[in-house]
Amino acid sequence: MKLVIVSGRSGSGKSVALRVLEDLGYYCVDNLPLPLIGSLLEQLKGSNDLVAISVDVRNLPEQDKVLVKQLASLPEGTELTSFFLNSSDKVLLKRYSETRRLHPLSKSRVSLQEAIKLEGKLLEPLSQQMDHYIDTSNLNIYELSDQVRQILLGSVDKELVINFESFGFKHGMPTEADFMFDVRFLPNPHWEPELRPLTGLDEPVAEFLNRQPLVNKFIWQIENLLETWLPHLERNNRSYLTIAIGCTGGQHRSVYVAEQLAKRFSNGKHKVNARHRELSHAKA
């Protein structure tokens, strides 16, 4: 089992780090009381091999001593990585002023500036227990995400999941699409009596469309467009990219084009899915 502990001052980016861990498949628990670490791992044993918890100043006093005790009693074979995120007082004050969020220690009737300084002192012993110290004062959320991935994976690369979805315009456009292509101008197998009851997944329809130069050219141009811009989309820390392909009914042309694009991109480094909305609805 792999356990990641994320701690740090409020406003330094703990929630960003947890989102990165969640994207990497970790079971994440925010603000877990330290005495519960052992019982959490025991409950998740066998079902989740990747676990991440965040620890902040609200957990309990003398956190460093409790943490040392908990880490000493971790189950055998637990691989531990820990982060402490920090920012300068000036940056934290600016972030809180911009977001207008309440600092965890503001309830003790101290000013925001005093709460920030007090938290830094309270967390100082805990920071000494962490493996990795990240100063986020000059980092944006993407740069912080890259640093966390670099430490955990040895690489900043993030697996992008590409979903190719076929649909029929007469049934409405998919709202989750990042890119949408209209293939209603392509030759339509619907007008071939022997092909009408079939779908774009059937070989006769695939052979018919594969013989059409216009179809092949359009697929190639979509492929070229996506290959050109995928690196830029990945650098923007996307987790999913949905490419919607629409024809009139979502039965022939859009299904075939989505399948062909999925096959071409499945040979690369990305995880690729093909989904056919109207065919799924027909089965249901």
Curated annotation (Swiss-Prot):
<comment type="similarity">
    <text>Belongs to the RapZ-like family.</text>
</comment>
<keyword id="KW-0547">Nucleotide-binding</keyword>
<dbReference type="GO" id="GO:0005525">
    <property type="term" value="F:GTP binding"/>
</dbReference>
<dbReference type="InterPro" id="IPR027417">
    <property type="entry name" value="P-loop_NTPase"/>
</dbReference>
<dbReference type="GO" id="GO:0005524">
    <property type="term" value="F:ATP binding"/>
</dbReference>
<feature type="binding site">
    <location>
        <begin position="56"/>
        <end position="59"/>
    </location>
    <ligand>
        <name>GTP</name>
    </ligand>
</feature>
<dbReference type="InterPro" id="IPR005337">
    <property type="entry name" value="RapZ-like"/>
</dbReference>
<keyword id="KW-0342">GTP-binding</keyword>
<dbReference type="Pfam" id="PF03668">
    <property type="entry name" value="RapZ-like_N"/>
</dbReference>
<dbReference type="InterPro" id="IPR053931">
    <property type="entry name" value="RapZ_C"/>
</dbReference>
<comment type="function">
    <text>Displays ATPase and GTPase activities.</text>
</comment>
<dbReference type="GO" id="GO:0060090">
    <property type="term" value="F:molecular adaptor activity"/>
</dbReference>
<dbReference type="InterPro" id="IPR053930">
    <property type="entry name" value="RapZ-like_N"/>
</dbReference>
<protein>
    <recommendedName>
        <fullName>Nucleotide-binding protein SO_3964</fullName>
    </recommendedName>
</protein>
<feature type="binding site">
    <location>
        <begin position="8"/>
        <end position="15"/>
    </location>
    <ligand>
        <name>ATP</name>
    </ligand>
</feature>
<keyword id="KW-0067">ATP-binding</keyword>
<dbReference type="Pfam" id="PF22740">
    <property type="entry name" value="PapZ_C"/>
</dbReference>
